[in-house]
Structures are given as structure tokens and as C-alpha cells.
């Protein structure tokens, strides 16, 4: 993926404001609520029976933070996203058998969460840069499947 200086600035500038714990928890909770079939990958998380249960679930919160912390590695390594996520791609494909479409869904939700939290900063240009980034991350995570 080729990045312009403006795209890099829009991504890193916004990322510096992100509360990884809060935005990560919200993004994963939204994924599990909006796309309930994704819950099957999180059976060990306990009660996911309602939106309230998902939002209040400490394991969802903790894993959301872990997911978004990992996403931060893409921000730090914009020019080497594929290699950055090689091991995670292998884990999600070979061991967890996650449908790669879920990576795209989570990326779409992350954009919604960022837009909600940073509406002034989330200009159409920022959205375009972030859309490019979440596509690149989803593609890198799905790489082992191809």
C-alpha cells in the first residue's frame, strides 16, 4: 500500500487522540451486537445474550483493547502492514478459523467509532485515509487464507 504524506498525517494525527481501551471495547462490542454471528468466536467470553451484556462484559472490553492495540501496530508500520500482521493472520486462519469477512466488518465499525468520537477531526479526507488503512489491515489479516 502506498501512502501520501497527507494520509499518513491524517492517520497518525487522529491515532494520537484515540483511547485504545475505550474505542477498542466499543468497536468489538458493536461488532458482536450488530453482527451477532461473530459471537461464535467468543464463546469463552460468557454472557453475550444482549447488547447490555456485551457492553458490560469485561472480557469483551479487554479483548477490544487488545485488538485496537494490535491495530496501532499498523499505524506505526504503515509501510509494512502485511509483515506486521503475518503471525496474527496465521493465528486467525489456522487456529481460530475466523471468517476473513469479519476483519472487514470490524474495520467498518472502527471507522464508525472513530467518527463518533472525533467528529470534528474525522473529515472526509480522514475517513478516506482510515478506510484505506482498515482495508489494508483486513487484507493483511486475510492473507493466510489466500
From Swiss-Prot:
<dbReference type="GO" id="GO:0005833">
    <property type="term" value="C:hemoglobin complex"/>
</dbReference>
<dbReference type="GO" id="GO:0031838">
    <property type="term" value="C:haptoglobin-hemoglobin complex"/>
</dbReference>
<feature type="binding site" description="distal binding residue">
    <location>
        <position position="63"/>
    </location>
    <ligand>
        <name>heme b</name>
    </ligand>
</feature>
<dbReference type="GO" id="GO:0046872">
    <property type="term" value="F:metal ion binding"/>
</dbReference>
<dbReference type="GO" id="GO:0042744">
    <property type="term" value="P:hydrogen peroxide catabolic process"/>
</dbReference>
<dbReference type="GO" id="GO:0072562">
    <property type="term" value="C:blood microparticle"/>
</dbReference>
<comment type="function">
    <text>Involved in oxygen transport from the lung to the various peripheral tissues.</text>
</comment>
<keyword id="KW-0479">Metal-binding</keyword>
<dbReference type="InterPro" id="IPR000971">
    <property type="entry name" value="Globin"/>
</dbReference>
<protein>
    <recommendedName>
        <fullName>Hemoglobin subunit beta</fullName>
    </recommendedName>
</protein>
<keyword id="KW-0813">Transport</keyword>
<feature type="binding site" description="proximal binding residue">
    <location>
        <position position="92"/>
    </location>
    <ligand>
        <name>heme b</name>
    </ligand>
</feature>
<dbReference type="GO" id="GO:0031720">
    <property type="term" value="F:haptoglobin binding"/>
</dbReference>
<dbReference type="GO" id="GO:0019825">
    <property type="term" value="F:oxygen binding"/>
</dbReference>
<keyword id="KW-0561">Oxygen transport</keyword>
<dbReference type="InterPro" id="IPR012292">
    <property type="entry name" value="Globin/Proto"/>
</dbReference>
<dbReference type="GO" id="GO:0004601">
    <property type="term" value="F:peroxidase activity"/>
</dbReference>
<keyword id="KW-0349">Heme</keyword>
<keyword id="KW-0408">Iron</keyword>
<dbReference type="GO" id="GO:0043177">
    <property type="term" value="F:organic acid binding"/>
</dbReference>
<dbReference type="Pfam" id="PF00042">
    <property type="entry name" value="Globin"/>
</dbReference>
<dbReference type="InterPro" id="IPR009050">
    <property type="entry name" value="Globin-like_sf"/>
</dbReference>
<dbReference type="InterPro" id="IPR002337">
    <property type="entry name" value="Hemoglobin_b"/>
</dbReference>
<feature type="domain" description="Globin">
    <location>
        <begin position="2"/>
        <end position="146"/>
    </location>
</feature>
<comment type="subunit">
    <text>Heterotetramer of two alpha chains and two beta chains.</text>
</comment>
<comment type="similarity">
    <text>Belongs to the globin family.</text>
</comment>
<dbReference type="InterPro" id="IPR050056">
    <property type="entry name" value="Hemoglobin_oxygen_transport"/>
</dbReference>
<dbReference type="GO" id="GO:0005344">
    <property type="term" value="F:oxygen carrier activity"/>
</dbReference>
<dbReference type="GO" id="GO:0020037">
    <property type="term" value="F:heme binding"/>
</dbReference>
Amino acid at each position: 500500500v502506498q501512502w501520501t504524506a497527507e494520509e499518513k498525517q491524517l492517520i497518525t494525527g487522529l491515532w494520537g487522540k484515540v483511547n485504545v481501551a475505550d474505542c477498542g471495547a466499543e468497536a468489538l462490542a458493536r461488532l458482536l451486537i450488530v453482527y451477532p454471528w461473530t459471537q461464535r468466536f467468543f464463546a469463552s467470553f460468557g454472557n453475550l445474550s444482549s447488547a447490555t451484556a456485551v457492553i458490560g462484559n469485561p472480557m469483551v472490553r479487554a479483548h477490544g483493547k487488545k485488538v485496537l492495540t494490535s491495530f496501532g501496530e499498523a499505524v506505526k508500520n504503515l509501510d509494512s502492514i502485511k509483515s506486521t500482521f503475518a503471525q496474527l493472520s496465521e493465528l486467525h486462519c489456522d487456529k481460530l478459523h475466523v471468517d476473513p469477512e469479519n476483519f472487514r466488518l470490524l474495520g467498518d465499525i472502527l471507522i464508525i467509532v472513530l467518527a463518533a468520537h472525533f467528529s470534528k477531526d474525522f473529515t472526509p479526507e480522514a475517513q478516506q485515509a482510515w478506510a484505506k488503512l482498515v482495508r489494508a489491515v483486513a487484507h493483511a489479516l486475510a492473507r493466510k487464507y489466500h
